[in-house]
């Protein structure tokens, strides 16, 4: 089940990531639905878009709680949550829900930046810290990033 988290309260330099879910949906109309590699067509799958969450832009924790609650509902219903962001921080809400259902959850992270800071400009809940927060939740405390394996102690 697809849902959007239009949030960008901790982005650096410029806002706009909150428009990501709408932009992804808009551009998806031009996608080819058939994959010759998978010999499958997206139209053969039941995919439901439940729309965007209404998130509080003044509180990262409140926004994350809403994202987590929605992911929990989807997981409890036996479905797979597919989150459209938004800035990187939205990932934390979904990971919080997923680790409750899958305690042995592992994370593979592809990005130009590690997002492993303990805090950024005094904030522990930031796009620049999100992977540190996620990996504090998972076991083992190691994960793969682009071109490197990191170990969090």
Residue locations for each model-derived region?
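Conserved alpha-helical scaffold segments that buttress catalytic/binding sites
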Residues: 1-153
């Amino acid at each position: 089940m697809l849902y959007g988290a239009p949030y960008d309260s901790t982005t650096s330099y410029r806002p706009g990531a909150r428009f990501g879910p709408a932009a992804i949906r808009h551009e998806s109309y031009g996608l080819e639905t058939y994959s010759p590699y998978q010999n499958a067509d997206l139209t053969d799958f039941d995919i439901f878009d439940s729309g965007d969450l209404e998130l509080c832009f003044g509180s990262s924790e409140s926004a994350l709680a809403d994202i987590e609650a929605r992911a929990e509902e989807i997981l409890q219903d036996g479905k797979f949550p597919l989150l459209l962001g938004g800035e990187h921080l939205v990932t934390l809400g979904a990971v919080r829900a997923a680790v409750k259902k899958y305690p042995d959850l592992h994370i593979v992270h592809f990005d130009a930046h590690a997002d492993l800071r303990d805090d950024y400009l005094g904030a522990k809940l930031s796009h620049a810290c999100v992977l540190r927060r996620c990996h504090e939740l998972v076991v083992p405390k190691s994960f793969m990033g682009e071109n490197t394996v990191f170990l969090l102690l």
